[in-house]
Amino acid sequence: MNHSADNTADTNIATGTPVAYAELHCVSNFSFLRGASHPQELVQQAVALGYQGLAITDECSLAGVVRAWQALQDLQQETQKDPSLAAKLENFRLIIGSEFHCDDHIFVVLVTDKKAYSELCRLITTCRRAAEKGTYLFNPGQLFDLQHCLLLWQPQQSFYAQPQQSQQPQQTQQAEFTRRLSHHFAHRLW
């Protein structure tokens, strides 16, 4: 999470108004050896900083979402005592998501509604059932089963490199995958 020195959201220099910001990829301590903070701490900090939203996106898991949601409910109870907190929570949105790794690519799937939530749960279940306990098996082709989710994609570094003669088939496959992904997700891919 980005933290400003005075613990408030960044402001537009020209107008002095707060800039709307939502963290769309944040892992909690439920992503073993990667996330350091408890989901409830992440929610509390995001609200304190004036974020408009926070996506809890643990790796092939929704484990952190329940505690994040509970923390948000607890904060809403405190608004009766703290009107400034009520103002910060008014437009705050907890976003449900999960990240998936494959060949140094990172895919972050975000939920927009109940249908998207169902799709994400199905994807996580499929990936977990295909592997030994504690791991998962994800194939990027599974993304084409998602009709309602949003997708953030961070390709591997070599994806951007100039292809060498021996890498032409791989580059052609990557270009085709990118085209298919862009077509399937249309305005839902970043």
Where are these regions (language model features)?
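Phosphodiester-processing cores and adjacent nucleic acid-binding clamps
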Residues: M1-W190
